[in-house]
């Protein structure tokens, strides 16, 4: 992966992929695009984007300092999308199963999660991690 390649693993350049979302120039039109952009936000330590794309009712429990610390302490090495259920441009809800790989304390780890997303007023939001 080069600096110009988007960290989300979609194969596009950052400017043609998640860059417009993180700069707030546009919004993701699918749940998968939002999930990929949130992964990229972790890689780039853009905690305000993570907060902005969190389901509004869950904002109270969001710990910005702890999230920033965790993002900074880990070196993100890759993302693999395993499954997508709904979450298209015409949907209001969807789920994305993924694996995010990262180095922490010299050890390679894999975070596997099935994320639930919901769309409100044309914007997708991360709601929660589901049991999988």
Regions found by a protein language model. Give the residues of each.
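A short beta-strand motif that forms part of the nucleic acid-binding face
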Residues: 12, 21, 100, 115, ...
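Hydrophobic pocket/interface hotspot
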Residues: 17, 50, 117
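Short helix-adjacent coil turns
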Residues: 38-49
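Short beta-strand edge/turn micro-motifs at domain boundaries
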Residues: 110-132
């Amino acid at each position: 992966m080069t600096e110009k390649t988007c960290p989300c693993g979609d194969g596009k350049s950052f400017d043609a992929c998640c860059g417009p979302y993180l700069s707030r120039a546009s919004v993701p039109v699918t749940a998968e695009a939002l999930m990929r952009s949130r992964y990229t936000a972790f890689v780039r330590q853009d905690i305000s984007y993570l907060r902005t794309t969190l389901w509004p009712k869950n904002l109270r429990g969001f710990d910005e300092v702890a999230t920033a610390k965790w993002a900074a302490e880990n070196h993100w090495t890759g993302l693999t999308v395993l499954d997508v259920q709904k979450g298209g441009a015409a949907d209001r809800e969807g789920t994305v199963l993924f694996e995010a790989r990262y180095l922490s304390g010299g050890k390679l780890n894999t975070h596997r999660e099935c994320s639930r997303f919901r769309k409100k007023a044309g914007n997708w939001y991360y709601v929660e991690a589901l049991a999988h």
